[in-house]
Amino acid sequence: MKHMIQNKQLTTSEKQKAKSEKRKTKNEKRRRDSIIPIKLYNTATKKKQILKPYRANTIRMFVCGPTVYDYAHIGHARTYIAYDMFVRFLRMAGYTVAYIQNITDIDDKIITRAREQKMIPKDLARKFEKEYRADMKNLLVISISRYVRATSKIKEIISQVKRLLEKKYAYFTPDGIYYDVSRFQDYGKLAGRTALSAEDSITRIDESVQKRNKGDFCLWKSAKPQEPKWKSPWGWGRPGWHIEDTAISEHFFGPQYEIHGGAVDLIFPHHQAEIAQMEALSGRKPMVQIWMHTGFLRIGKEKMSKSLGNFTTIRDAMRTVPAHVLRLFIASTLYRSPILFHESMIQQARENWETINSMYNTIRLMHARIAHNTNAKREISRIQQYQKQFRAMLADGFNTPRALAIVFTYIKFIQSLGQSLSQETRAAALEFFTDIDTVFGILQKQKLSAIPRTITNLVAKREQFRNNKQWQQADAVRKQIERAGYCVEDTPSGSRLRKK
């Protein structure tokens, strides 16, 4: 009897456990079934390809962060907002994303600026790292899993340099340890360059009369007076720029992972150097499945950069341009294309944001009809069709301008219904807006009481008159709306309602 009771208790426990496991399996299957396949343009292959996680539905992504010696400018905003929206989409699409961004907190530029400011380099770097992270918070960049300082991985950097020396990919000079690019057959392939053309690059390349090849870059710099330094097997020194990123990515992701991103000016030599280092160390190819690069943000015909002195800091820009508008401005251009920063473009983004946000709040605050109507099924089907198209545009090369075009078509459809929405239609419409905000991070709830049903009915009535080209009647309804304390504005994207 005792044995039977024990069996019964065990069976009950097992049943509970089995139910729990069944729920987990069901949820996991639902999650797998909802995963959206994604195609991305790969800089390395110059074509779009399907993203294939090495681990089940998990994406590891590394993006080159800032060198923290000054305030970040809106060129940085363009890059980091674009990647923020991309990672938001990956997560919405059902993927688990580990997104790491490095902080270059030791570099020649930091040392030079610290000397100019009569500061300790570490203090200068900490100051501007703090300011950068504050800028990202203000820009609603929320997707980064972890920031990693280069100086937090000195041990890993030394390990990589040591292994490159052992494999004969590196050599000693009086001023440091250099990578021999002639030893890496594919050097320059990422950018369609050769090792001999390295000196033509506009980005940082280490100069030394002791180098074997013009394109060779420094892995470990010998210590100089009054500069930060760390102890190594080769004496005191500090890391070169390129080795910092591979030390971080190898530590967290291993020698191969899914996505590496940065701005287009990092393709050569920086990202090519990373490939040369990591593939030489591991013997595995490719280091990264897909390389993503954001286009320049331009002022006139020039890219915005600190070196050219034509930059606007993020905090200065945000004095007149809210984060929601700046994010929509950036989403309006394909991430890998150049984008022109001009007042007319910002104004267009401002107007587009007003249209989207106004419609969102109109639906959110309206009194929905309680009764189901005969058109609800058709209306919901159309909304879900637009929602599906929106996701499809993002899944095909992360084409944000095409996705936004779907959003404006959807808004016009909602306006064309010409009546207050049923509960079912309103719920479907808000679900689509949730998708829009999940990816773009642009919606802002109005702090208003619900829009009275009489007003939404008047707006719908006016829209019907406009659709029928009954302009006099539409104008009369507009005046009624205005007398009630609201304004209705007509734009190319449709009508917007706001409180006076």
Feature-to-residue mapping (PLM):
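Structural preference for alpha-helix termini/caps and helix-kink/transition segments
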Residues: 303, 310-500
